[in-house]
Amino acid sequence: MNPNKIDAIVVHCSATPAGKDVRAADIDRMHRAKGWKMIGYNYVIDLDGTIEIGRPLTMDGAHCNTAGVSGVAYNKHSIGICYVGGIEGTTNAKGQIVPKLDARGRQIPKDTRTDAQKTAMHKLILDLFHQYPIVEVIGHRDASPDKDGNGVINRYEWIKDCPCFDVKSEFPIAICRASKT
């Protein structure tokens, strides 16, 4: 990816249970197991708020291949930020943190960000606004297709729940731009 073309941020979750300590190296292994060259995200925010570097910004991302407002796949012009979590967790009989399942046996999406993760995410996004001409901050789910053509990505249109919170309302462009002054 050409860093001069970066104009968007896409926020993700790792889709791992709340409280389970997962690091960028773990996500890298998961992504390589899928046949990818390396971790798809540029940044990973750990449970304690540590921001880890993932895929270099000089490489195309591997986090959101949907085309954005520019008509170009986000992987070509966006920064991918992933927070660890996003699935409701529970502790099993062995004391391991595992996904909590609903009545149909599906994982339960949930905003599991710790206070430290929220603080780190806000700082990182505002820092990126100072470094790049960002015009869009979205959650991965916001890149789902607008099936009914009403200009809004409604919940029933989401391909996935990731990142399990409303990124657009938490990071409105006007507020982020105002932070530059």
Where are these regions (language model features)?
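Short Gly/aromatic-enriched secondary-structure transition segments
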Residues: 24-31
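Short Gly/Pro-enriched turn/cap motifs at secondary-structure boundaries
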Residues: 33-34, 69-72
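Basic/polar, cationic surfaces and motifs that engage anionic cell-wall
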Residues: 1-10, 14, 18, 48-51, ...
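Flexible, surface-exposed loop/gating regions in the mature catalytic domains
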Residues: 59-68
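Short beta-strand scaffold segments in enzyme catalytic cores
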Residues: 41-45
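Glycine-rich catalytic cores of cysteine/serine-nucleophile enzymes that process amide/ester linkages
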Residues: 25, 38, 51-54, 62
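N-terminal cationic-hydrophobic initiation segments that often serve targeting/anchoring roles
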Residues: 32-35, 129-130
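Short secondary-structure junction motifs
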Residues: 38-40, 134
